[in-house]
């Protein structure tokens, strides 16, 4: 049990008992030893909605959490928990400010309800360091009877639009998709007869979001998020054929996320911005949507459907550009050639939706971020290496 009755926190961690909090200490320390950060969801939104905690209790709880974990280097505080921020906002405000009054060194964010961004309620909150949105698990047209819908109909999969809407709030803060569609989960979550999200879907969500201006991305898997064991049904759309979590580690989407990270980190990161003006033709709709991003001397365009693209190479420095195509599924690079600084039309040779999706990369020819004969980008992951989380 995590908390005693009536929020008497003096009894939350009894001496001589291996308590909930002792076990959480163990998990956080084990994660630190393996270079993993913990997104610490302080309380799930349903508990706040049910009024099982008030602002005064939240203040005391926040102090308890902050004092216990302020010296753990691998904590990111998460307010919310799949809930709209206008439902008892006084609880979230009290909890967040209480933690921040003691713990000044950890980042803090808010996890909203599906199809919302935290910026809708917390754009001015001093305690919030970066925004998240939840694009959710619905396919195009899957409104599912909702009367009050915060997005236009038939835009459910367009997660890039949440980045645009979040950037419109001031002050601008980093943002990422905290809950996109998860690999191997039914579209819409609960119906086992629905088709499931595949590797090419989770790739699309990742590249669309990051190229639209996200600072990172969240990958999820139906089995992994539940640490699903053999013999147990999944909580979401079980058809009786779910794999255990350790088998899901071999699934393609899980192993393809690294190619996006490997692409982004060797390039100048903090100068990168979204820039749809690179696309001199049509931006496209739905699966034909092109997403463009650039730095000062490089530009990239993600193309899910391999549609022909009209692109303006003049948007970044250099009278000549070296151009590559990167296969999003396997990270393989193909050097296309050198091009003059002008508008060009590029048509990917492999045109199979979601199977041959990839990234057009153009770099100022005077720069050496990539080599012409390079077949892959070096793995940028720090997982498995000794890492100082106090850095």
Q: For the regions a protein language model found, what residue spans apply to each?
A:
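Mature, folded catalytic cores of secreted/periplasmic enzymes
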Residues: 31-34, 40-44, 65-66, 70, ...
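Aromatic- and carboxylate-lined catalytic core of secreted/periplasmic carbohydrate-active enzymes
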Residues: 171-175, 182-185, 198, 202-337, ...
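Active-site mouth of glycoside hydrolases
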Residues: 1-142, 153, 157-158
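Short amphipathic alpha-helical segments and helix-helix/interface helices
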Residues: 28, 66, 96, 163-167, ...
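Catalytic-core region of carbohydrate-active enzymes that cleave or remodel glycosidic bonds
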Residues: 125-231
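A structural signal for well-ordered alpha-helical segments within the folded catalytic domains
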Residues: 22-25, 63, 90-93, 160, ...
């Amino acid at each position: 049990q995590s908390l005693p009755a009536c929020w008497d926190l003096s009894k939350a961690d009894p001496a001589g008992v291996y308590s909930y909090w002792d076990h959480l200490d163990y998990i956080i320390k084990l994660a630190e030893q393996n270079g993993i950060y913990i997104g610490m969801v302080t309380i799930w939104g349903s508990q706040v909605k049910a009024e099982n905690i008030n602002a005064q209790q939240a203040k005391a709880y926040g102090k308890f959490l902050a004092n216990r974990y302020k010296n753990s280097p691998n904590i990111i505080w998460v307010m919310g928990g799949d809930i709209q921020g206008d439902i008892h906002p006084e609880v979230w405000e009290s909890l967040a400010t209480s933690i921040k009054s003691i713990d000044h060194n950890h980042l803090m964010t808010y996890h909203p309800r599906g199809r919302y961004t935290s910026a809708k309620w917390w754009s001015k909150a001093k305690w919030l360091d970066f925004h998240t949105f939840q694009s959710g698990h619905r396919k195009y047209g899957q409104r599912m009877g909702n009367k009050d819908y915060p997005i236009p109909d038939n835009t459910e999969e367009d997660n890039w639009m949440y980045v645009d809407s979040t950037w419109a709030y001031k002050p601008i803060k980093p943002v990422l998709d905290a809950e996109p569609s998860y690999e191997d989960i039914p579209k819409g979550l609960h119906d086992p007869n629905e088709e499931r999200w595949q590797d090419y879907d989770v790739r699309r969500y990742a590249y669309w979001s990051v190229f639209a201006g996200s600072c990172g991305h969240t990958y999820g898997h139906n089995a992994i998020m539940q640490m699903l064991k053999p013999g147990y049904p999944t909580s979401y759309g079980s058809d009786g054929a779910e794999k255990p979590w350790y088998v899901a580690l071999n699934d393609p989407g899980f192993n393809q996320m690294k190619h996006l990270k490997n692409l982004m980190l060797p390039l100048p990161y903090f100068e990168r911005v979204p820039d749809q003006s690179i696309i001199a033709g049509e931006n496209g709709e739905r699966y034909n949507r092109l997403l463009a991003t650039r730095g000062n001397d490089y530009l990239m365009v993600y193309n899910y459907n391999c549609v022909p693209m009209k692109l303006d190479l003049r948007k970044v420095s250099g009278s000549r550009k070296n151009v590559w195509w990167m296969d999003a599924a396997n990270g393989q690079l193909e050097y296309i050639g050198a091009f003059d600084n002008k508008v060009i039309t590029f048509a990917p040779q492999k045109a199979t939706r979601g199977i041959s999706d990839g990234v057009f990369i153009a770099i100022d020819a005077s720069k050496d971020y990539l080599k012409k004969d390079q077949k892959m980008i070096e793995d940028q992951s720090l997982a498995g290496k000794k890492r100082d989380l106090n850095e």
